[in-house]
Structures are given as C-alpha cells and as structure tokens.
Amino acid sequence: MRYLFIIGAAVLLSLISGMTPAYAQRFNIGTYNLRYANHGDSMHGNGWGQRLPVIAAQIRFHDFDIFGTQEGLHHMLEGLRDSLPGYTYIGIGRDDGKTAGEHSAIFYKTGKFKLLDHGDFWLSDVPDRPNKGWDAVLPRICTWGKFREISTGYVFYMFNLHMDHIGVRARAESAKLVLLKIKEFSAGTPVILTGDFNVDQTNESYRLINESGVLRDCYELSPIRLATNGTFNNFRADGKTDSRIDHIFVSKQFTVDRYGVLTDTYRLKEDTGNKYTARTPSDHFPVMAGVEFGKGFRGR
C-alpha cells in the first residue's frame, strides 16, 4: 500500500528544535495512545498494520527520546520496537502481569538512557496484582522506570498510565495513588508522569495532580505551545476540540521549553486513484514536550 506521510502544523516544533543547539541535557518526552489493534478498526481503514509505519515515522521525525504509550498489546509493542532501531521498552500486560492485555509501556533510546530499575502497579487499592480498582470497568496499570541520562549522569523517574474511561472515583483515586507512589519511589528525585488520563484540563482528577505541588502540566509551563487541537480525535482528521485528555507532567527540577499536540496526518489513495483520504495515525494525537535538566538533578 502506498503511503504519503503529511506533516501537519506540528512540524513547527521540530523546526524550532533545529534552530537551537542540541545540548546533552535536553530531551523530548512524548505520550502516545496507540489505539489497540482490533478488527473493527481494520474494517474502517484504520488497522494497526496500516498505522504502524506511520506512527514509527512520526516518532522518528519528532525525535522522541522517551515516551509513554497506552493501549499497546504485546505484538503491537514488539512491532513498534522493531520499527524503531535504538529504542526498547518496559511494561507488562494489565490482564495477567505478563503479556496479556493492554500495556502502559515506556519506550526509550538505549543510547541516551540507562535503565536502573523499573516496575508496575495496578491502579487499585490492591496495586500489586491484576484487578479492577474502585468503580473502574477495566483493570488499569501504571509502569515506571528509573533512568540515568548517560552523558550527564542525571537520574530521574518516569511513570506512565492509562486511567479508566468510565469510573469517576477510579480516576480520582488513581491520581491520589500515583502521587503517593511517586513520593514513595522517587524520594525527591525528579519525576515525569505521562499518560491517557481520560479527563481534560478542567476535571478535578487532573487538578489533583496539577495542583499537588509535586507535578505540573507541561502545557502550563512551556513558553512555546503548539496546541491547535485537543488530543482525542476518534480517527477524524477534521475533528476539533479544546479538550486535552493526554498529558505530560513534570516535577519542578525540569525546565520545559516547548509543548505540542502533534496533529500530523497521512493520506491513503482510494481505489479510483483520483482521491486521497486523510487519516490520523491513532484515535489520539500524541503529545510532546521538550525539557531540560534544571536544578536538583544528581547522579546515582
């Protein structure tokens, strides 16, 4: 199948990056809901096999150094890793703690970061084994990693999650739980939190995190923003919303220099050969933030 990859307005972020020197202490964070592979999407022209090369090209083009994913099934994550030389990932399946079900995997460049430790917990009052928490309709999992930036020796934690899409209490309790875990694991070490939170910037569960004094939304911290759309598109290239349900939060030791909702699309040639249909790589737009190491970083 012939692909024409069309870089949208989000290309400006990469152009801006190219205008400044590439210092070792700077890197790009991403969060990307990949949309789980299913037959229904394939029947409507949005199958994973079709989308995978576009997503991989998008990640390479925007030069994600480390990024959280949501809804990735094991075979999807293996395929994405194979399509991204120089990257690997951590994370387990939410259904059995092994490979079954959706993952909240974290991908990272192996030449830039050394993995020091990692783990997973369920968004539940029983976080150490597969289960559904509170009023959630599905099991939900958070994956975390402790990383060292190789060139500087700086150490940080990254947490990545996917909150429930139905349970209101589950989302609020999940926000409290992840903040508790961040404080427990990091002990003052700088932290990144990414994910599909299934709530936008007006919701109480979002505010629990953003007003916690532990983390802040990169959207609010960035002097340069390119957010011409929200983050859930439902596979509609022409959709428009101001609602951002996919977020990147960082602790105070990071300096954020840019933020973007990446609205890139691609084109598929129809059978007639005379018309092209715009497609989004997933039913969510990925989010990217450029950050720098600031005060409070140390090597371990």
Model-flagged regions — what are they?
Residues K146, R169, E173, L180-V191, ...:
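Metal-dependent phosphoester-hydrolase catalytic domains
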Residues F5, M19-S83, R94-E102, K176, ...:
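N-terminal, active-site-proximal structural segment of metallo-dependent hydrolase catalytic domains
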Residues I66-Y157, G260-L262:
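Structured beta-strand-rich core segments of catalytic domains in phosphoester-bond hydrolases
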Residues F27-L34, I55-L80, F107, G145, ...:
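Active-site beta-strand/loop signature of hydrolases that rely on acidic residues for catalysis
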Residues V137-I141, R148-A172, K176, E184-F185:
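Metal-dependent phosphoester/phosphodiester hydrolase catalytic core
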Residues L34-A37, G72-M76, R94-K98, K112-F113, ...:
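Solvent-exposed loop/turn segments at secondary-structure junctions
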